[in-house]
Amino acid sequence: MNREQIHILFFPFMAHGHMIPLLDMAKLFARRGAKSTLLTTPINAKILEKPIEAFKVQNPDLEIGIKILNFPCVELGLPEGCENRDFINSYQKSDSFDLFLKFLFSTKYMKQQLESFIETTKPSALVADMFFPWATESAEKIGVPRLVFHGTSSFALCCSYNMRIHKPHKKVASSSTPFVIPGLPGDIVITEDQANVTNEETPFGKFWKEVRESETSSFGVLVNSFYELESSYADFYRSFVAKKAWHIGPLSLSNRGIAEKAGRGKKANIDEQECLKWLDSKTPGSVVYLSFGSGTGLPNEQLLEIAFGLEGSGQNFIWVVSKNENQVGTGENEDWLPKGFEERNKGKGLIIRGWAPQVLILDHKAIGGFVTHCGWNSTLEGIAAGLPMVTWPMGAEQFYNEKLLTKVLRIGVNVGATELVKKGKLISRAQVEKAVREVIGGEKAEERRLRAKELGEMAKAAVEEGGSSYNDVNKFMEELNGRK
């Protein structure tokens, strides 16, 4: 083959939930013969360097690397070290959303550096996060196709699009009144509270308008999903929303072996082998895994309800508590745990404070259910592992993903969340207990388990040679080759 090697730049937004799937994508394209370069800032480069080096050791003939872009926080009016969402999540002040907005708008500082690098390297394509709408203009200026990466499902993108076009929330009595999203396959019922509608007159609303406009003028969209999972919505999206969309996921399946699965994000707060040994001692399908994503810190009152609910369910569990370091202590002094909780549940439950090797855990045969916030990375990792889920959406587009799990795929049990977590309504211990019992051993548990297992097999088939996602990678690379 005399074709020039394809070179793709990957530019993730600086947050773990955005960096991890684009790292997976960079590895996927490297495995398919492309040269992959990840663009990021100094602090985030340190997070990506270790998994990239490990990947290169295992695959010395493949090309993958990092280009560091300067991001002078203090000069931009940000606190020292404010280079990713982790910093903002740990920022213990009431104006943390204002800091997030300032951080978001400050990323445009990298525009000139991006353009210089594109000009110098002349890559085949730029895959840039949706949070960088200005990247479309940068790529266009130099004649390089810009692909958008949203990091969510086609289903959620279709829901958002139709909410914006039809504005059904304007036609109901209140923000908690349910309505059907018009024009979509199936009856998707939601409320304005759950849809997390952005006021278009606010700075954030105006930013989203820029995001949509940049997508319209971009070359296309790369979706971390697989066609069979949401075919009606993938077709709808290609017909009405995006000119071109390639479904190339689940991206988490581009990780092979224990070390690669364990090394995707930050260093885990538990020894992987110790965790696997604990799981090996449990009956298949008997453990429920709870994790609410890297960006969700729940109040102590809610953690207490979860603890009582778990204990009441009688199930084995692994519970990942992702709170800020100054909020989570160790041992029995923690005021978010019932007195004597860990002692009473020794052998039955495992609490991981901080970061967990999630894909490694979900893939273990002992796991029988996953309690999730319905962030798309976690949702798709649960689907790829063939697991039924307890859905507990908290913000962003998570209520849409919940509808996909509970109403379309029918592999989810709703814990009872009806509005965004920031509104402060607690889920009770009784609700937690009921949902956990139901997902593991309820009346419809077996039916749900079989459907989830089938979807897991379909996910794995999609990324194998001849599968739908494998073929979409081919089609995308052929399209890039055709542009030369």
Swiss-Prot record:
Tissue specificity, in the record's words, reads: Specifically expressed in roots.
Q: Which UniProt keywords apply?
A: Detoxification, Glycosyltransferase, Transferase
Amino-acid positions noted as binding UDP-alpha-D-glucose in the UniProt annotation, renumbered to this chain = A356, Q358, H373, W376, N377, S378, E381, E397, Q398
Residues that hold an anthocyanidin according to the record: H18, N89, A396
EC class, as a word, reads: transferase
Which Gene Ontology terms describe the biological processes this protein takes part in?
A: response to other organism; response to toxic substance
Parts of the chain that traverse the membrane: none
Question: Reaction catalysed by this chain?
Answer: a flavonol + UDP-alpha-D-glucose = a flavonol 3-O-beta-D-glucoside + UDP + H(+)
Q: Record's InterPro entries?
A: UDP_glucos_trans, UDP_glycos_trans_CS
Give the residues annotated as active site: H18, D129
What is known about what this protein does?
Answer: Possesses quercetin 3-O-glucosyltransferase and low 7-O-glucosyltransferase activities in vitro. Also active in vitro on benzoates and benzoate derivatives. Can detoxify the explosive 2,4,6-trinitrotoluene in plant by forming O- or C-glucose conjugates.
**Which protein, by its recorded name, is this?**
UDP-glycosyltransferase 73B4
Q: Give the source species.
A: Arabidopsis thaliana
- Gene this protein is translated from: UGT73B4
